[in-house]
């Protein structure tokens, strides 16, 4: 649960030049057998085995994330497929990731796990603006999902993994694939949706 990730505080450090973009892309996954046997609490007691395959859509990874520096010390979130945008200026706004139905719950929770809220940060900052000032830039995250959430293709989990992996690159956190998948599980606990481990592993590995 969230205790796991609160112990793992992060110390994000800008890892790109001002004109660079981190571009993360992932396929989605299809269950062949064993769906939901990966989901706690069942998997904790009985173990779980899932066979799945990763697929692309029209030859393109259907889930894409772009992260780039932003001149102002704030966080800008955009969704191309939903035509939505939100500007985040405070820790409180960033911590609104458990609001059901928000198009930006996943990137907000991912930013939290990357160390951009006090509970997950190694360093205490008086405000998000001050933290981004110390970080050296604001952050703009753009999401593109060619497949709707709730499609049964693991979209939300894999989008979460893709955002976390891209943030790891952008912030020099050096998370490997196992760490990204572990934090995806933590992210889903933060969003209170819960979930197993096969979705993110099916798309990331």
Feature roles, as predicted:
Residues 1-153, 165-177, 182:
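ATP-binding N-lobe of GHMP and related small-molecule kinases
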Residues 162:
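Acidic/polar active-site rim loop that often engages polyanionic ligands
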Residues 175-205:
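Alpha/beta catalytic cores of group-transfer enzymes, especially the acyltransferase/condensing modules
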Residues 156:
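Short, conserved phosphate/pyrophosphate- and ester-handling motifs at nucleotide-, phospho-/glycolipid
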């Amino acid at each position: 649960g969230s205790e796991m990730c609160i112990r793992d505080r992060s110390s994000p450090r800008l890892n790109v030049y001002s004109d660079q973009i981190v571009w993360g892309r992932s396929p989605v996954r299809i269950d062949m057998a064993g769906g939901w046997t990966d989901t706690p609490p069942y998997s904790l007691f009985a173990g779980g085995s899932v066979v799945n395959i990763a697929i692309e859509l029209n030859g393109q990874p259907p889930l894409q994330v772009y992260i780039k520096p932003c001149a102002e010390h704030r966080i800008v979130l955009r969704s191309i497929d939903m035509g939505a945008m939100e500007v985040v200026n405070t820790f409180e706004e960033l911590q609104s990731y458990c609001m059901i139905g928000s198009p930006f719950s996943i990137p907000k929770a991912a930013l939290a796990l990357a160390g951009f809220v006090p509970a997950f940060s190694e360093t205490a900052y008086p405000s998000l603006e001050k933290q981004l000032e110390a970080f050296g830039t604001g952050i703009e995250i753009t999401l593109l999902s060619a497949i709707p959430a709730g499609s049964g293709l693991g979209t939300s989990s894999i989008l979460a993994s893709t955002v976390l992996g891209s943030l790891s690159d952008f912030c020099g956190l050096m998370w490997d694939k196992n760490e990204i998948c572990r934090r995806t599980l933590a992210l889903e606990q933060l969003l209170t949706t819960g979930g197993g481990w096969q979705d993110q592993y099916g798309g990331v590995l």
